[in-house]
Amino acid sequence: VKYFVTLFIIVISCNTFAQQQKTNEIWNGADAFSMDNLGNLYIIKESVVFKADTSGRILLTYSNNNQDRFTYVDAIDPLRIMLFADEFSIVSFLDNKLALQSVINLREQNFYDIKAVCNATDGFWCYDHSQQQLFKYNFTLQKIAETQPLALLLNNPLSITSMCANDKWVACLNNNSGILIFDRLGSYVRSFDAKHASCIMLLENMLVYAENNELIFIDLKLNLETSRLKTDINNINSIKWFHNCFYLLANNKIIQIAYKKD
């Protein structure tokens, strides 16, 4: 009984957000976006990358001369902005001035079926579907971590469409199945049943994912859902957080939502 009372108190005392929402559309026409920890947005529109502030004011642009269509951007490291062109499995890194630093052709590293990548503070992760594994490389292309073949760990079919990482966790969205959690070294931790999740984000020890028009919060240390936030926004494709605001990509628009903790 004491355990359940304690658990109930934990759930009740978890931080929640007020349902009153102040929304602001700051960008129209984005294919993908990311944010760094300084509040800069990095927005992809086909083969062009825009760096903008939180009001949507353009600060810098980068245009790809090779005509690779970027499909993903990750700014977890503000000094190494990661871009991914999935058609040719090419990863590019820009500095904070959007100057090109390096280009990595993953096919030249014998990866021919890369479905998802993400940045990390000491390298980058990629998911190769043909091998059904996650691999982590440093910036000199030395392999520093890998998972077991995921088919040995899971019963569900694998269709990983996106991933994200911080200095504690790696999260993968397994489409129409759930979310896979690994530690920073690639050891499998657990899965969450989230068949309708559309995107994921890591915030310290918190996993945040979108499901329909809600944001769901999971404490990864407690393995506990702490709260849900209902929004007026559907088709959420990406979630970012900066300075008491969520930034959501939905229907090619970036929408800023201010929240106040209760």
Name each model feature, range by range.
Residues V1-T23, K261:
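Bacterial Sec-dependent N-terminal signal peptides
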Residues Q19-I26, R57-S63, L100-R107, K143-N155, ...:
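A short beta-strand motif characteristic of beta-propeller blades
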Residues N24-S47:
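Beta-strand-rich domains and repeat architectures in extracellular enzymes and scaffolds
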Residues N28-D36, Q67-A75, F111-A120, N155-M163, ...:
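Repeated scaffold domains used in trafficking and secretory/extracellular systems
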Residues I43-K45, M82-E87, L94, C126-Q131, ...:
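Conserved beta-strand positions in repeat-built beta-propeller and related beta-rich domains
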Residues F50-K51, I90-S92, F135, I179-I181, ...:
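WD40 beta-propeller blade core
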Residues D53-R57, D95-A99, N138-L141, D183-S187, ...:
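Short loop/turn segments that connect beta-strands within beta-propeller blades
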Residues N237-D262:
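Blade-level signature of beta-propeller repeat domains, shared across WD40, Kelch, NHL, RCC1
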